[in-house]
Amino acid sequence: MALDKFIKKFINGDASAFDEIYNRTRKSVYYVALSILRDKALAEDVMQITYMRVLKNIQSYTLGTNASAWIIKIAKNEAINMKKVRMREQSVDEYENLALFGVNEPDTYGELTDLAKRLLDDDEFSILMLVTACGYKRKEIGKMFDMPIPTVTWKYQNALLKLRNALEKEGY
């Protein structure tokens, strides 16, 4: 496990090893948070919280297990917690929440990502982004989400089909 080497270095006092842990997991953490929260700023907040929790709890990580899955699980739990809190606080005023009423700010990640965020459920979006943007294998994603590989594959294929159908409807 590549991350284990850096975790061990960090535990032994090499603070620069955390940079490598961050660089190797940041895209995954971001896209998992984004898939749950559907908000870039909140996803970035979850990233900060996630890495603070990783720093705080790195001593409890068991070397030899899947470090990526451990970090992704923390991010997923933090995003779910934030979503629950936001749902309780969410205003239904049209002017305060334009995104709820169909008006979105332009997304720097592209129209296709916007379309995927709108069409896909949380798992489908997470899996799609982890495969396409982060380069994870379905087996790795299955471990991250405690999901059988055939289920990951099905959700990935389903996400692609939904996107293809939507693009065909729009004339692409």
Question: What is each model feature region?
Answer:
Residues 7-29, 125:
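A short, charge-rich alpha-helical start-of-domain segment used by transcription regulators
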Residues 11-12, 38, 49-66, 85-86:
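Sigma70-family region 2
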Residues 12, 87, 99-130, 134-143:
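Amphipathic alpha-helical segment used for protein-protein interaction
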Residues 22-40, 57, 117, 166-169:
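Amphipathic, Lys/Arg- and hydrophobic-enriched alpha-helical face
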Residues 26, 30, 51, 125, ...:
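C-terminal flanking helix
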Residues 31, 45-52, 56, 65-77:
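Structural recognition of an alpha-helix C-terminal capping motif at a helix-to-coil junction
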Residues 56-63, 72-92:
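Arg/Lys-rich amphipathic alpha helix in sigma70-family domain 2
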Residues 80, 133, 138-139, 143-172:
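DNA-recognition helix of helix-turn-helix
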